[in-house]
Amino acid sequence: MPKVGLFNKEGQQVGDIQLNEQVFGVEVNKYALHQVVVAQLANKRQGTQSAKTRSEVRGGGIKPWRQKGTGRARQGSIRAPQWIKGGVVFAPKPRDYRMSIPKSMRKVAMTSALTSKVADMVVLEDLTFEAPKTKEAVKMLNAFEAKKTLIITAEVNENVYKSARNIRGVTVMPVNNINVYDLLNCKTLMITKEAVNKIEEVYA
């Protein structure tokens, strides 16, 4: 079983914690990670981009000049794509980019992402602030020399969220909002002991 240090928010190690091998010690499946990240980013897309083709632009129904005899290039419509204010060739239309991923693949990707972050994981005994204080959050992050950090709490914690939301490169989320992309995108994974237990309950 993987074992990592257990720390307080001052950066002092207060013990160790055994991690569940079925969640934090699996073989990393790069294919599943790729599929889930691609789907996650695709699902964020609005898909509302739209432009008009030559048939949809107003006007242009009449031939601008006769076919032959003018010395100019032949033209059929002032709304052809080569004209100013003409239609767009292969104009983009609203579409749905959503991708669905099987539940089993999502689980494999999540456990793979968690396993890949064990070396960069800081497990906190507890994480609470009496009031929203960015200074306190910065002090804690500096104690661990954390860069581009994802902080995962067991529940929604307003004081922790408000303390860290103005710090560049820091994301705070409750354990039920964790996702593969954010896990892979962080340099340091800071997670409370209670959040670890909840993850193991779901994915073990």
Curated annotation (Swiss-Prot):
Region described as Disordered: 44-76
Molecular function GO labels: rRNA binding; structural constituent of ribosome
One annotated Gene Ontology cellular component of this protein: ribosome
InterPro entries in the cross-refs: Ribosomal_uL4 (IPR002136), Ribosomal_uL4-like (IPR013005), Ribosomal_uL4_dom_sf (IPR023574)
Keywords linked to the UniProt accession: Ribonucleoprotein, Ribosomal protein, RNA-binding, rRNA-binding
One GO term of the biological process aspect: translation
Listed Pfam families: Ribosomal_L4 (PF00573)
Main function: One of the primary rRNA binding proteins, this protein initially binds near the 5'-end of the 23S rRNA. It is important during the early stages of 50S assembly. It makes multiple contacts with different domains of the 23S rRNA in the assembled 50S subunit and ribosome.
Subunit structure: Part of the 50S ribosomal subunit.
Family from the record: Belongs to the universal ribosomal protein uL4 family.
Protein's recorded name: Large ribosomal subunit protein uL4
